Amino acid sequence: ANAGDNLLEVARGANVAIDAPCSGNGACGKCRVQLKGGELDSKKTLHISDEEFEKGWRLACMSKICADVEVLVPDIASAYKSRMKVADLSSKEEIAIFEKAKNQVEETGIQLRNSLEVVELQMAEPTLDDTMPDVERLTRALRKFMNLKRIRVPYAVLRKLPDVLRASKFSVKCVVRVTPDDMFVYDIFDAKEDVIMGGLAVDIGTTTVSAVIINMATGEILAKSSSGNGQIRYGADVINRIIETTKPGGIKKLQDAVIKETINPMIHEMCRSIHLPENQIYRMCVASNTTMNHLFAGINADYLRTEPYIPAFFKTNSLFASDVGIEINGDAHIIMAPNIGSYVGGDITAGTLVSMIWNRPEFSLFIDLGTNGELVFGNSDFMMSCACSAGPAFE
């Protein structure tokens, strides 16, 4: 830190959590710290009484560093940034909730299909009379199996291919995605190995992030986790976080807070609990409000807060794990539940689907009461939605 630096910004840079719901605008009075040594250039504020000021209390957002300084940071932020929790999924209730939702959707005629599968191949070993390169040997075997012209083998698979083929005596399993036009090879294993096709579903809330890992072959939930959203130190509501992104390097800071500090540690902890390598997660689904979608993808969200409130996207299929630094299989496709408005996001799309409002003749009201609140009203004939602030009072 240097003389003249803002204390709240210095604390954020050092990953010290200070409760600042207004993101440092001096409006909420929550970022209180106590001066224990050294000197701060602090503005007087109505949030700190004269008596408290004499005892060293200051607002971090209204304080500049003069020289070496020691401050006490109260453990206020822990109320927001909860510790990570990995849930026990052995209870019948957890299984029943998921099964009920899945069955209700399927009963309407919607087919839940998985475009990923594991294929087992036995190839002839190369000889002096058969000197075909490894990758062509693999694609030839896959082409016979699937009768597809275009087969894509990414660098990560190509790099491990020679060793896996020879260790397995050319008897392998491949994790592939098949479309009407082509096939993509995600991974390759010895045929003797048990292969789990992992899928990751994440709900990015303004305050809390929840996630599950599933077995994409069986639909079984393998692990579940929740954690406070690391972005909380940049503001409790979406508007203050958008404002934070307008500062130099702000978009990257907000993206790192939700991915590097929140989602990736959750992935590692869940994978550790079920003994699943992270690179065996081949698909990711994200449901979140429109602002969180933009911040997750590292896309400028500033135009969401000013008229006419236009997002960069409602839906996108162009995102992959390696694009945003999600630590799973780098070629994993990230599917984002589509937003339907500037402040009505993919979390509501997903919730509406599962709540079955769209398939019922009677009127229903679906409410997602989070920091950003959304409501959907309607039935099988129509649905309408709106959003409201449901977090900090000054929002």
Predicted features by range, described:
Residues 202-206, 211-239, 303-316, 350, ...:
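Glycine-rich phosphate-binding loop of actin/hexokinase-like ATP-binding domains
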Residues 10-14, 19, 29-80:
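Iron-sulfur (Fe-S) cluster-binding segments and ferredoxin-like electron-carrier domains
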Residues 1-44, 211, 225, 266, ...:
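N-terminal cofactor/phosphate-binding cores enriched in small/glycine residues
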Residues 52-55, 59-201, 206, 218, ...:
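Nucleotide/phosphate-binding catalytic cleft detector across ATP-hydrolyzing
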Residues 30-32, 280-290, 369-371:
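A glycine-rich phosphate-binding loop feature that marks nucleotide/adenosyl-phosphate handling sites
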Residues 43-52, 335-339, 392-395:
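Short beta-alpha connecting loops at secondary-structure transitions
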Residues 230-273:
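N-terminal phosphate-binding loop and adjacent alpha-helix
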Residues 25-29, 61, 374-376:
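FAD-binding core of FAD-dependent oxidoreductases
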